[in-house]
Amino acid sequence: MDKYTNRDHPDYIPGTFNIYSSQNLENGIIYESKLKKTSSGVVLIPQPSYSPNDPLNWSSWRKLAHFGLMAFITAFTAATSNDAGAAQDSLNEIYGISYDSMNTGAGVLFLGIGWSTLFLAPFANLYGRKITYIVCTTLGLFGALWFALAKRTSDTIWSQLFVGISESCAEAQVQLSLSDIFFQHQLGSVLTVYIMCTSIGTFLGPLIAGYISAFTNFRWVGWVAVIISGGLLITIIFGCEETYFDRGQYMTPLTSCQSGYEDGTTLQNSDNTAVSRRKRHLDAKLSTPGAMGEKGVDLSETAEFEVNNEEEVTIPETRELIDGSKEHLKPYPKRVAILTKATNLKGYGFKQYFKYLKINLRMFLFPPVWLSGMFWGIQDVFLTFYLTTQESAYYEPPWNYSDFGVAIMNVPTLIGAVIGCICAGIVSDYFVLWMARHNRGILEAEFRLYFSIATAIIGPAGLLMFGIGTARQWPWQAIYVGLGFVGFAWGCSGDIAMAYLMDCYPDMVLEGMVCTAIINNTISCIFTFTCSDWLAASGTENTYIALAVINFGITAFALPMYYYGKRIRLWTKRWYLQSVNLRDGV
């Protein structure tokens, strides 16, 4: 039993990994097969099964094809969620739809993104990942069509609700799909591309929509989205492979840590009291009064996280483990099936659906979820502010920008976001591995937070340069550099938020991202309604000084989390394990 890979081990701490095999794991053999590792000796986490249908065993081209589709979904939904501004002048002039109504539509969009993420998430655990992409793309197509035909205020508001729902699949489902096909040590780089795609859609979407509106008319902003949504929907239906795979049913190299016997095709646990065995593992460290963990944490404090007596933790009964090496690759029609029923689906899954909703909401009790949500959410708030400032200030003297000039202001922000993604993603992957090598191979989730230092300095500096520069009419070069700094903080913070949370609770990726999306988009919704009033009441310069202070303050939360993060993960371990067992036992 290895404490870094087996969550039943009494010394297991979520978010603490050993990038190299420990002595126990190196000697652990099942069917004469050692643990799977990279060519450089990094242990693959999670350990793949022997089945050709395991997404972790997909060929490189299959992974790249799926990754490319997920990247396009992310970029496209981000773009459609930010393109309405290109049509607001025309809607105001032709139909008298006020700018306040457009802001209301933006607020509704954020609510649609955040809360539909929660209500759609259980479908991924019941009917596979693919169905959510189909539902979201279909609703996005409908929202774009409604916007293309908009003539009334209600059209501009309610169409944005459907557009927001369409982006919800990129808030949590995409990350889940990517974690299905990539290993732990690859997620930093993968998330970098994810955040870059979000950046491209967020910053280039308004630019492209502006050109479409200028060269045709504002309705084509919606019609182009309809056309692309239709093509994307067809691609998803016929080309998107399902990544749901119940690895718990299959033998992996880690099953060498279990007692069992070989019967030719299966491995069956010889201990028929799986529940009591798991209880012994959990209670050994977690239920002993005054038991002390690493850094002197009193584990008895976790008692407050115990499940109520009337709420049973359902753990699947002991079952035979399948030797996946004897399976054949599924035929293509089954690999792209619209629905892939979960192995634990009961009937139509109505009761399970509401149980999954409850489990998702449990993640609000985990401090790293709040840190991730605030990191991501506050950057979206700044996005709202500087886009509003661009639209309200730069059409007027002394700037006198055209629609194209204002749209071009998104380019330096995009460049900064790409650099931030690379810094917090690819560079951080090498950095955390370097840190782990100097820590006896032990990788802590908090290593990712080192890169918050750059965000805490560069982000506020960018807000000050843009805000004060706009108010005092500085040269455009200083203002554009400020926008680049803001973009850097946007990309860097997003990457840190996603990677840190996925490292902290690797078996609850979807649930964590759902709560992060709710926090993020609820914060964004609130500030969408207050942005214009704040700028009008305090003025551009004072508003951006306040935003810079808020940026630094929220980013500074990374410091106590770095020092106390492992203690918090240990403190929430029992609740985490119970949540995983509840989900897997639904």
From Swiss-Prot:
Membrane topology: Multi-pass membrane protein
UniProt xrefs under Gene3D superfamilies: MFS general substrate transporter like domains
Xref: Pfam families: MFS_1 (PF07690)
Encoding gene, per UniProt annotation: HOL1
Cytoplasmic compartment residues: 88-103, 152-189, 241-362, 435-448, 499-508, 566-586
Biological source species: Saccharomyces cerevisiae (strain ATCC 204508 / S288c) (Baker's yeast)
CC annotations in GO: cell periphery; fungal-type vacuole; mitochondrion; plasma membrane
GO biological process: monoatomic cation transport; organic hydroxy compound transport; polyamine transmembrane transport; transmembrane transport
Subcellular location per the Swiss-Prot or TrEMBL entry: Membrane
Disulfide bond entries: none
Protein name per Swiss-Prot or TrEMBL: Protein HOL1
Keywords from the named record: Membrane, Transmembrane, Transmembrane helix, Transport
Extracellular side: 1-66, 125-130, 211-219, 384-413, 470-477, 530-544
GO molecular function, one term: inorganic cation transmembrane transporter activity
CDD domains xrefs: MFS_Tpo1_MDR_like (cd17323)
SUPFAM superfamilies: MFS general substrate transporter (SSF103473)
Transmembrane residue ranges: 67-87, 104-124, 131-151, 190-210, 220-240, 363-383, 414-434, 449-469, 478-498, 509-529, 545-565
Biological role stated in the UniProt entry: Seems to be involved in the uptake of several cations and of histidinol.
